[in-house]
Design a protein with these regions (language model features):
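N-terminal presequence-like segments and adjacent domain-start helices
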Residues: 1-11
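Extended interaction regions within the primary functional domain
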Residues: 9, 13, 22-27, 69-70, ...
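Short, non-transmembrane amphipathic alpha-helical segments
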Residues: 15-18, 50-74
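Short edge beta-strands and adjacent turn/loop segments
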Residues: 22-41
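Generic "edge-of-domain/loop-turn" microfeature
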Residues: 36-38, 49-51, 84
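Beta-strand secondary-structure signal
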Residues: 41-43, 76
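Short beta-strand-to-loop capping motifs
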Residues: 44-48
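Polar/charged, Gly/Pro-rich intrinsically disordered segments
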Residues: 75-105
Length: 105
């Protein structure tokens, strides 16, 4: 297992976790790693309040991402409502962003 968690590694971990777990209300999913604190952060931003099913699925995603790290790491997963067209914040590495009318222009 690697000791360096760079952009490609983090994005591949997040994207693998997102396979078949993306819900229509998910606007963006992002990830970053704090190597000093040994914490991987995963942020899910939804169009309005996420359904219980979306929360459960995305918690599974965060767990799968954490599974790619050594046992002494923790995950900080956040689920926030950011109704369209409000601006998304995101963490360092954006792994998923929903296509929205502003993006399609």
């Amino acid at each position: 297992m690697t000791d360096t968690y760079d952009r490609p590694w983090l994005l591949l971990s997040l994207l693998r976790g997102l396979l078949s777990e993306v819900h229509p209300s998910l606007r963006q999913a992002s990830v970053e790693a704090d190597q000093e604190a040994k914490i991987v952060r995963v942020l899910f931003e939804y169009d309005g309040s996420p359904s219980p099913m979306a929360l459960e699925s995305d918690s599974c995603v965060a767990g799968q991402v954490l599974g790619d790290f050594p046992a002494d790491w923790d995950v900080d997963e956040r689920h926030v409502a950011v109704a369209y067209p409000n601006e998304l914040s995101g963490l360092t590495h954006i792994g998923y962003r929903r296509l929205e009318p502003v993006d399609a222009a």
